[in-house]
A protein has these predicted regions:
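A conserved beta-strand-loop-helix scaffold within acyl/acetyltransferase catalytic domains
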Residues: 2, 6-89, 154-310
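Acyl-donor binding region in acyl/amide transferases
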Residues: 54-55, 77-176, 296-324
Length: 324
């Protein structure tokens, strides 16, 4: 699509790709600090992306040297069967109508599937004026590509930025971009004094220590197992059903994962991606996932049987297990 074209901004140029196979050889070297921009993860998106998503990969060059990489995603909300079924009030119905009819073709500069600043990474310091130019120009070029196909992009979103980055970008071409906050990126810092789960629990107030004990007691009979690739394949249908229940009942959703997403991610990322199954009487009733991102352990998607969740405080126990 863009194989013969490179867009230049002063000394910095960028090139847009629509296939992981086309990416420069040094892509992963540049993206080494963020797994969500590495080819192992991008290949997962390419092989098991949501049915309504198309991905684009942006290489940023200084002369001929690759110094930055970025991700863009196009979503066709017309292909989405539900925006989320938890809230059924009148305002939600109006919101869904507006999205379906006036914002159905949406372009994200960044990763719409996760929270956190995972939209771009550089090997050297680049001023925010240049970053804003690259992101805006990339969005314009991808928008033009779809326009030539007869598809009008209704909404362009740039996500996510830490506050100090947002402040700097607003000084330049982002000055006219509407800024909004949505679901937060929750960060849990581990105290270096904590060497065991007991140390963590001991640091809690009495209220939350009691909650921990109550949740653990409710979890009796649940067996947690780190699933191998073969086991993920074996339980793939159940894993997806558990995920789909949680996703469908979220207050708002713009995509649903493909059924083979978790097995593809396990195959591509190996031990960096962990999927923990929760079994009751040998039946899989829940799962949570973790992905090692440099020195950060990222929580990914999860799923559970709602009846077991209520009775056994499954979700809360998953959160506790993630701290181990």
């Amino acid at each position: 699509m863009w194989s013969d074209f490179t867009f230049t901004l002063d000394q910095i140029s960028f090139k847009i790709y629509n296939s992981v196979a086309e990416l420069p050889a040094l892509w992963d070297t540049v993206a080494q600090s963020n797994v969500f921009l590495q080819t192992s993860y991008l290949s997962v998106l390419e092989r098991s992306a949501p049915v309504n998503m198309e991905c684009f990969y942006i290489g940023i060059f200084e002369k001929s040297e690759l110094i930055g990489v970025s991700l863009a995603q196009y979503l066709d909300l017309n292909k989405l069967e539900s925006f989320g079924e938890r809230d059924k009030c009148f305002k939600t119905a109006i919101r869904n109508f507006i999205f379906k009819n006036f914002a159905s073709h949406t372009l994200f500069l960044g990763n719409n599937m996760i929270t956190g600043q995972n939209g771009y990474v550089f090997t050297k310091e680049i001023d925010f004026e240049c970053i804003s130019d690259i992101l805006i120009q990339s969005a314009e070029e991808i928008t033009l590509y779809f326009k030539k196909k007869g598809i009008n992009i209704h909404l362009v979103s740039f996500k996510d930025f830490y506050e100090h980055c947002s402040v700097e970008l607003k000084k330049f071409r982002f000055s006219d971009v509407y800024e909004f906050n949505t679901q937060p990126n929750m960060i849990f810092y581990l105290d270096e004094k904590w060497k065991s789960e007991e140390d963590y629990v001991g640091a809690l107030s009495k209220k939350y220590r009691d909650q921990f004990k109550r949740a653990r007691k409710k979890n009796d009979g649940i067996i947690v197992k780190n699933l191998s690739f073969e086991e993920v394949i074996h339980h793939e249908n159940t894993i997806y059903d558990l995920y789909y229940y949680v996703a469908k009942n979220a207050p708002f959703n713009t995509f649903f994962l493909a059924k083979n997403h978790f097995s593809t991610l396990k195959e591509q990322c190996g031990n960096r991606f962990q999927i923990f199954g929760y079994f009751l009487n040998d039946k899989l009733v829940g799962f949570h996932t973790l992905l090692l991102n440099d020195e950060t352990l990222e929580t990914y998607f999860l799923g559970y049987d709602e009846t077991i969740q209520k009775e056994n405080m499954l979700y809360l126990n998953m959160l506790y297990n993630m701290t181990k």
